């Protein structure tokens, strides 16, 4: 699939899931912080660290693994919620976007399904969540640029972050 969309999907999921009162979302910043702890602990900087180990390091009970498939429409977005201790799947969900412009709406539907699947107590509250395309943006390129900005900022690259934020 189009790998430039992966960051956009995860950024959109983070924005959507942060609306939950019952889920404690650590987000990309915590992930990058945990990853940095591995790299400063004498590990090779180019070392690939499994997401499960990073989730353990930051104290997460569960973590998300998501991807988007399809180099062109239709796009399939899949999301697994995994138990940090056992790596067992707590939920495995999928949404389809018929065209690129529909990806933010598909992310919103997927986040709503994740919240319900994880037992968010009030289905009404989940349904009242502000869709990504209204809360932030309906533009996938803007989501991707924002994700690049967040990643650059967390890596200490402020000039790159500013450029990416301006593009978003």
Regions found by a protein language model. Name each.
Residues 1-78, 83-100, 124-138:
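Short beta-strand->alpha-helix linker/helix-N-cap micro-motif
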Residues 1, 37-38, 104-155:
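Mid-sequence helix-capping/hinge segment at a functional interface
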């Amino acid at each position: 699939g189009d790998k430039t969309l992966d960051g956009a999907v995860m950024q959109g999921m983070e924005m959507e899931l942060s609306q939950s009162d019952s889920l404690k979302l650590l987000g990309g910043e915590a992930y990058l912080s945990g990853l940095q702890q591995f790299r400063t602990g004498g590990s090779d900087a180019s070392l690939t660290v499994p997401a499960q180990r990073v989730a353990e390091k930051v104290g997460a009970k569960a973590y998300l693994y998501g991807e988007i498939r399809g180099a062109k429409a239709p796009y399939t977005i899949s999301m697994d919620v995994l138990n940090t201790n056992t790596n067992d799947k707590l939920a495995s969900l999928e949404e389809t976007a018929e065209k690129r412009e529909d990806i933010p709406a598909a992310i919103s539907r997927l986040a709503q399904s994740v919240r319900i699947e994880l037992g968010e107590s009030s289905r009404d509250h989940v349904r009242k969540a502000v869709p990504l395309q209204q809360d932030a943006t309906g533009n996938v390129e803007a989501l991707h640029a924002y994700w690049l900005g967040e990643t650059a900022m967390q890596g200490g690259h402020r000039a790159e972050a500013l450029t990416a934020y301006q593009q978003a």
